[in-house]
């Protein structure tokens, strides 16, 4: 089954201010896929949030992948901007929504292309 996964910055602050911020996130994403090979169909990075369409082989794979991705991104972002100890980057745990119909999957894929 495919899932729509998303997360936002705390109080909808900006996660990605400049192109280097997007590139840094994508480097973490490449590392995450190398560590936990989660099939990703599409993703979309917005200034204050992101969306993914994925098809995990297990529920554990989904949780492990996005936990590692958000934790690592947060740590590296704080290190880069010297904001360690200033609080959370994300509003909380990522959200997941199962896509049980082809129409739902197609709609989210169009949104995240």
Could you describe each region identified by the protein language model?
Residues 1-113:
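Short catalytic/metal-binding and nucleic-acid-binding patches
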